[in-house]
């Protein structure tokens, strides 16, 4: 009982002492979110609505008509999720993309084909927070997102299936009746079954782009043919003439075309081109 009375006395003393203490005053209690508006730099304010508007402007202004480019335009027209950007800026996966694209000229493909300058310029502006009035942060993010997706899909589809559709390109070179101005039929010069990039392949590649295996998948799309590897090594030589480099580039592209291989021994005849193998 004595212990209980003692504890009760202590609690009563502490309670009375606490009641006599002055209330704690917080110096920032009057600050609201509106009070922070003066600290906000509008130059760095990201607007999802503005980013979408700029992406729509880029895709509508695009004159590219390849299957990959049309796929990308439909992807953003349907309001699908962004792959390379978010409200914090650019994803680190863009660095992996740039790293792989930086070596594309070793494959006899120009960096212009994969919008390398647009991507690196936009990425640099975001990292340095260096924006211009006519290219603000929202435009820069939109440019990075749009061109990164086009570049990525152009690269993986081009390295796997070829950057040129041989049937579409070669079968529109010669007219059947060149002297007849009314004739619109072309002579068939390429009639070999060749694999083509499809929506399923691009869907699977976009899933890889949003994951950590991005760089690995990009490198896995490279042609493994030993003849292609030999041509690639020759293309890296510094003593080649322009004509030699062009010839190597054309043959490297031909090895990218995926043609079905027969089982065992077989004869392959390209009738339109009169080639017997």
Language-model segments: residues:
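A broad, structure-centric signal for solvent-exposed, well-ordered loop/edge residues
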Residues: 7-8, 259
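Auxiliary tRNA-acceptor-end handling modules of aminoacyl-tRNA synthetases
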Residues: 20-277
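C-terminal motif of bacterial Sec signal peptides marking the signal peptidase cleavage site
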Residues: 15-18
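Bacterial N-terminal signal peptides that target proteins for export
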Residues: 1-7
